[in-house]
Protein backbone atom coordinates (compact mmCIF):
# COMPACT_ATOMS: atom_id res chain seq x y z
CA UNK A 1 0.00 0.00 0.00
CA UNK A 2 1.65 3.18 -1.23
CA UNK A 3 1.08 6.39 0.78
CA UNK A 4 -0.70 9.07 -1.20
CA UNK A 5 -0.27 12.80 -1.49
CA UNK A 6 -3.42 14.72 -0.62
CA UNK A 7 -5.24 16.23 -3.56
CA UNK A 8 -6.64 19.75 -3.71
CA UNK A 9 -8.98 19.30 -0.73
CA UNK A 10 -7.91 16.54 1.63
CA UNK A 11 -10.97 16.92 3.82
CA UNK A 12 -13.35 16.02 1.02
CA UNK A 13 -14.60 12.49 1.16
CA UNK A 14 -14.35 10.04 -1.65
CA UNK A 15 -15.73 6.53 -1.93
CA UNK A 16 -13.65 3.41 -2.21
CA UNK A 17 -12.31 0.46 -0.30
CA UNK A 18 -10.73 1.17 3.08
CA UNK A 19 -7.20 -0.32 3.15
CA UNK A 20 -7.59 -1.17 6.84
CA UNK A 21 -10.98 -2.90 7.11
CA UNK A 22 -11.75 -3.58 3.44
CA UNK A 23 -15.23 -2.02 3.48
CA UNK A 24 -16.57 -0.02 0.52
CA UNK A 25 -17.48 3.29 2.16
CA UNK A 26 -16.74 7.02 2.11
CA UNK A 27 -13.07 7.65 2.87
CA UNK A 28 -11.24 10.37 4.79
CA UNK A 29 -7.57 11.34 4.57
CA UNK A 30 -5.23 10.27 7.41
CA UNK A 31 -1.83 12.00 7.57
CA UNK A 32 0.84 9.43 8.42
CA UNK A 33 2.63 12.18 10.34
CA UNK A 34 -0.19 14.14 12.01
CA UNK A 35 -0.42 17.83 11.11
CA UNK A 36 -0.25 18.79 14.78
CA UNK A 37 3.47 17.88 14.89
CA UNK A 38 4.51 19.36 11.52
CA UNK A 39 5.84 22.54 13.14
CA UNK A 40 7.98 20.79 15.74
CA UNK A 41 11.70 21.26 15.03
CA UNK A 42 12.45 17.53 15.02
CA UNK A 43 9.97 16.85 12.24
CA UNK A 44 10.86 19.96 10.21
CA UNK A 45 14.51 18.93 10.34
CA UNK A 46 14.08 15.27 9.35
CA UNK A 47 11.17 15.39 6.88
CA UNK A 48 10.45 17.52 3.84
CA UNK A 49 7.01 19.00 3.16
CA UNK A 50 6.11 16.24 0.71
CA UNK A 51 6.81 13.51 3.28
CA UNK A 52 4.90 15.35 6.00
CA UNK A 53 1.83 15.49 3.77
CA UNK A 54 1.74 11.79 2.84
CA UNK A 55 -1.16 9.75 4.07
CA UNK A 56 -3.87 7.22 3.40
CA UNK A 57 -7.53 7.44 2.55
CA UNK A 58 -9.45 5.29 5.05
CA UNK A 59 -12.95 5.02 6.46
CA UNK A 60 -14.03 7.24 9.35
CA UNK A 61 -14.30 4.34 11.85
CA UNK A 62 -10.75 3.14 11.21
CA UNK A 63 -9.45 6.71 11.22
CA UNK A 64 -11.16 7.53 14.53
CA UNK A 65 -9.94 4.27 16.07
CA UNK A 66 -6.33 5.12 15.27
CA UNK A 67 -6.59 8.53 16.92
CA UNK A 68 -8.42 7.15 19.98
CA UNK A 69 -5.66 4.63 20.63
CA UNK A 70 -2.57 6.77 20.03
CA UNK A 71 -1.68 10.42 20.51
CA UNK A 72 -0.24 12.47 17.64
CA UNK A 73 3.39 12.27 18.79
CA UNK A 74 3.25 8.46 19.05
CA UNK A 75 1.66 8.24 15.62
CA UNK A 76 4.36 10.50 14.16
CA UNK A 77 7.25 8.59 15.72
CA UNK A 78 6.09 4.97 15.63
CA UNK A 79 3.26 4.68 13.10
CA UNK A 80 4.36 6.89 10.20
CA UNK A 81 4.13 4.17 7.54
CA UNK A 82 1.12 2.18 6.31
CA UNK A 83 2.95 -1.03 7.22
CA UNK A 84 3.43 0.08 10.84
CA UNK A 85 -0.26 0.95 11.18
CA UNK A 86 -1.40 -2.38 9.77
CA UNK A 87 1.12 -4.42 11.81
CA UNK A 88 0.03 -3.10 15.23
CA UNK A 89 -1.92 -5.84 17.11
CA UNK A 90 -4.27 -3.39 18.85
CA UNK A 91 -5.12 -1.67 15.57
CA UNK A 92 -5.51 -5.05 13.83
CA UNK A 93 -8.19 -6.00 16.39
CA UNK A 94 -9.93 -2.67 15.82
CA UNK A 95 -9.80 -3.02 12.02
CA UNK A 96 -11.21 -6.57 12.28
CA UNK A 97 -14.06 -5.26 14.45
CA UNK A 98 -14.78 -2.45 11.98
CA UNK A 99 -14.83 -4.95 9.10
CA UNK A 100 -17.73 -6.76 10.80
CA UNK A 101 -19.81 -3.59 11.19
CA UNK A 102 -22.56 -2.59 8.82
CA UNK A 103 -22.55 0.85 7.29
CA UNK A 104 -25.60 2.87 8.31
Ranges and model annotations:
Residues 19-55:
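Histidine-centered nuclease catalytic patch
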Residues 1-10, 74-104:
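Short, intrinsically disordered terminal segments enriched in charged and Pro/Gly residues
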Residues 3-11, 32-43, 59, 71:
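Residue-level signal for well-ordered alpha-helical segments
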Residues 55-75:
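Short Cys/His-centered divalent metal-binding micro-motifs
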Residues 1-17, 47-53:
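Short, charged surface segments at domain edges that flank catalytic/cofactor-binding sites
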Residues 50-51, 58-61, 87-93:
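Short C-terminal domain-edge/linker segments immediately following a structured domain
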Amino acid sequence: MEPLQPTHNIRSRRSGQCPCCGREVALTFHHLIPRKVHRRPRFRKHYDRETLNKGLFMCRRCHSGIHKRYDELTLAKDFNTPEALLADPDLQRHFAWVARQRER
